[in-house]
Each structure stands twice: as structure tokens, then as C-alpha cells.
UniProtKB/Swiss-Prot annotation:
Signal peptide: none annotated. Pfam families: Hfq. One of its GO terms (biological process) is regulation of DNA-templated transcription. One of its GO terms (molecular function) is RNA binding. NCBIfam families: Hfq (TIGR02383), PRK00395.1 (NF001602). The keyword Membrane does not apply. Residues 70-81 have a biased composition (Low complexity). Homohexamer. GO terms for cellular component: cytosol. This is RNA-binding protein Hfq. The gene is hfq. Residues 9-68 form the Sm domain. HAMAP family: Hfq (MF_00436). RNA chaperone that binds small regulatory RNA (sRNAs) and mRNAs to facilitate mRNA translational regulation in response to envelope stress, environmental stress and changes in metabolite concentrations. Also binds with high specificity to tRNAs. The lineage of its organism: Bacteria, Pseudomonadati, Pseudomonadota, Gammaproteobacteria, Pasteurellales. It comes from Glaesserella parasuis serovar 5 (strain SH0165) (Haemophilus parasuis).
Amino acid sequence: MAKGQSLQDPYLNALRRERIPVSIYLVNGIKLQGQIESFDQFVILLKNTVSQMVYKHAISTVVPARAISHNNNSNHAHQAAPVQSAEVVEKVE
């Protein structure tokens, strides 16, 4: 596992395993919402009414709809701040 993925993989896996709704902001400002179905080194499968394959290089930010706890390889817990979620997919200007 590459050093850069030592936090990314456990974080995404916790979101997937707990079926936490997420908002994914792309570098072009598009906001996608759904649940992480699966992921690998290059893509995330995001499921809502349809499944979308989102390339990681296009992602700016992943925001969970509620706080989560996960452990990375150094056993430090991290909690994400809860955010309000909306059902509408929108472009952030």
C-alpha cells in the first residue's frame, strides 16, 4: 500500500461499511451524493438512484453526512464533522 493511501483506504472503507451517505465535490465544482459502494486505487463507485464510477483524480472533497469514527494504521481516531445533506445534486459556483 502506498504511503498516501494509509489514511484514504480505511476512511473510505468505514464510509462504505457503515453505509454513510456522502457528498463528493469534484474539482470542477459538481456535487455528487450517494453511498460508497466500492473503491479501488483509482475510482469510487457511488450509488444513489444509479451507480456512478467517479475517478479519484477528479475529486476535491469527500464529506460524510454524519460523524464517523475510524482508525488508521497508527490507531488514531478521527471524527468528521456532521453536515447537512440535501437531495439535490448541484453545481457549486
